[in-house]
Regions:
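Short beta-strand edge segments in extracellular beta-sheet folds
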Residues: 306-316
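Extracellular/periplasmic metallocenter environments
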Residues: 281
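Glycoside hydrolase catalytic-domain context in secreted enzymes
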Residues: 1-275, 284-300, 315-609
Length: 609
């Protein structure tokens, strides 16, 4: 009896702990894909087929992180068995990855034809069909390193209930792998197509610290296509440890026909490679050589030249804003050396730079309407149009959005309507209108034979025929259906490495914001792909701050083409796990904060303000 009593007590304690952990995590349930045990038996017709396609799917979402288990970040035994069987059976076999994040493909790395389809919204099926049929040529590149699970050194520094220690410092993603010499399965910036390209140097020039690189990109294959030119800089190794290389510029070519070539010019400022000195609270370029590498992935570059900096240069004076964590950042032991003989050199001194001094001002200007509000009215203003019933939506044409500023303060005549959505606007698909206002409804409760189509202001709307004798939903004078476009996830947009495509996606959102009377889109997400298990990595662009900032700016510019339509760059900042996100404490050095986690926000704001 004592043993049984102790067992039951432990079970009850575990039950309570699970409830506590779920509550603290504050998330939604994320399930791994189940493993089905079966034998893959092909019919005679299938045996004689020319090609086989296997689609691997994964999901994730807000509130909970992914897990290091089979069916999530790992392949199941059945998936491995089936993929390898089909790969050996069919000469033409394609593994399609319909995923929003990294999956460890080590067990199937022998498969030579893998398509990262990602999650592309309404066009997903069309794109897959066009690629299979050869009507379109994929040209994307990875914005996150895909590696074997054992090669991720800092796996344990993730998912803690309270404190999360960013001990990797600035060595995030490819900055870590390249610096320690670990070869991932698929490096940052990597991506194949139905053709191949050669990138050669035309010229390397400068105007003070702005470096200009002209390249020639030639299509050497038998199919038209596009290439992504990527420029990396390996910084001086003087004084302080630094990543082996960092992306400083990228550009997508236009479509290049076979045997044709194009010239492109990319530029960057050397000041953007400066490291942050925590002791002196400034950005500094250490004297030494800065090597310029150009290629089509972080793992495939050529040295095009180098910059010789004759002295230390302070590029920006700031002040520290972060408290020191109780740990030391990771430092690699590798020292990098390149043979720079017969390589073009550009010589710079501190006279080629201007020191940026930041003036801090805490003056806050408010509208006159705000100045006259009392504390109660200010409180209402802060919490927005809060109603303690989830069935109620925001007022206006588009009910059921993420929120609305308050209508309960008489002095505030105008309100802002906001819509969530990581891949386009999230709106209620159906809502009802009666004498009380607007109400969110569930489509499953509506009987379609009670509705008719009406044309209002040139738009077709599905409305409920009103009758006082009707029961159930008879109170609603009108039922309105509305749908927004499902766009590619942020990671997929970034993998295009095409800022014009980013602007186009933003344009779609901005246009629909105008239709639905939405003022602010609660996107794009700016957080870094610090860890492959973050449940919302699909909402974010990349492990690299330059890609994140550039693509966020592109989306923002697309939205802001429309008057009074805007975005909210989120989540500011260091929100890199979902578990216990409302209570967790992200601890990092000032250097990591500024060089990695704030950099994307800075780029987006500066380029899209």
């Amino acid at each position: 009896y004592p043993t049984l009593k102790e067992q039951k007590a432990n079970e009850h304690l575990n039950y309570i702990n699970n409830i506590f952990m779920t509550y603290k995590g504050g998330g939604f349930s994320m399930v791994s894909f189940p493993e089905y045990e079966y034998d893959l038996k092909l019919t005679p017709e299938e045996e004689n087929a020319d090609i086989a396609i296997y689609v691997l799917a994964r999901n994730s979402g807000e509130g909970m992180d992914r897990r290091l288990i089979k069916g999530d970040a790992l392949l199941t035994d059945t998936e491995i068995k089936d993929i390898l069987y089909l790969n050996n059976k069919f000469k033409k076999f394609m593994l399609v990855l319909n995923v929003g994040g990294v999956v460890d493909l080590t067990p199937v790395k022998l498969v030579s034809n893998i398509l990262l389809l990602s999650q592309l919204g309404v066009v997903t099926g069309d794109i897959l069909a066009n690629i299979i049929l050869g009507k379109q040529n994929p040209s994307g590149k990875l914005t996150t390193t895909w590696a074997s699970i054992p090669d991720y050194k800092f796996l344990k520094e993730f998912g803690s209930l309270d404190d999360t220690n960013y001990v990797e410092g600035v060595y995030v993603g490819y900055r870590y792998f390249d610096s320690v010499g670990v070869k991932p399965l698929y490096p940052f910036g990597y991506g194949l197509s139905y053709t191949s390209f050669d990138i050669s140097k035309v010229s390397l020039t400068n105007e003070k610290d702005e470096i200009k690189i002209k390249v020639k990109v030639k299509n050497e294959g038998d199919f038209y296509g596009k290439e992504v030119v990527q420029v990396y800089v390996s910084p001086s190794q003087e004084n302080v440890d630094k990543p082996y290389q960092s992306l400083v510029a990228f550009a997508k070519t236009p479509k290049i026909e076979k045997a044709k070539e194009v010239e492109m010019t990319l530029n960057f400022k050397l000041r953007n490679v400066a490291r942050y000195d925590e002791k002196k609270a400034n950005y500094i370029l250490d004297k030494g050589n800065y090597i310029i590498r150009v290629g089509n992935s972080s793992d495939c570059t050529k040295v095009f030249g180098y910059i010789e900096l004759t002295e230390d240069v302070i590029t920006e004076d700031l002040k520290n804003i972060n408290s020191n964590p109780d740990f030391e950042d990771f430092k690699p032991e590798v020292i990098y050396k390149d043979n720079l003989k017969n390589v073009q050199k550009i010589k710079l001194t501190k006279n080629d730079f201007t020191i940026k001094k930041v003036e801090y001002s805490y003056e806050c200007k408010t509208q006159k309407e705000i100045e006259n509000l009392d504390n109660k009215e200010l409180a209402k203003l802060c919490i927005g149009n809060y109603i303690d019933r989830k069935t109620e939506g925001s007022l206006g044409m588009g009910t059921g959005f993420a929120g609305q500023t308050t209508k309960y303060v008489e002095e505030i005549k105008n309100t802002l309507i906001m819509a969530d959505g990581p891949a386009g606007l999230r709106v209620s698909k159906v809502y009802g209108i009666d004498y009380r206002g607007y109400h969110k409804l569930s489509p499953s409760t509506l009987l379609m034979n009670d509705y008719s189509f009406y044309e209002i202001q040139g738009k077709i709307t599905l409305e409920k025929d009103y009758s006082e004798k009707e029961s159930s939903f008879s109170d609603y004078r009108k039922i309105v259906h509305q749908y927004a476009t499902a766009l590619p996830i942020a990671t997929a947009i970034a993998q295009s490495f095409n800022v014009e495509f980013g602007k186009l996606c933003g344009d779609i959102v901005g246009k629909e914001m105008k239709v639905f009377n939405i003022h602010l889109w609660l996107a794009p997400g700016m957080n870094i792909h610090r860890h492959i298990l973050c449940g919302r990595n699909f909402e974010y662009f990349s492990e690299d701050p330059l890609v994140s900032g550039k693509m966020a700016a592109a989306l923002t510019l697309g939205v802001q083409k429309y008057k009074n339509k805007g975005v909210t760059l989120k989540h500011f900042t260091g929100n890199n796990q979902e578990f216990n996100r409302l209570n967790s404490n992200s601890k990092m050095s000032e250097r990591a904060l500024r060089e990695i986690y704030l950099k994307g926000f800075q780029i987006a704001i500066e380029e899209a303000h």
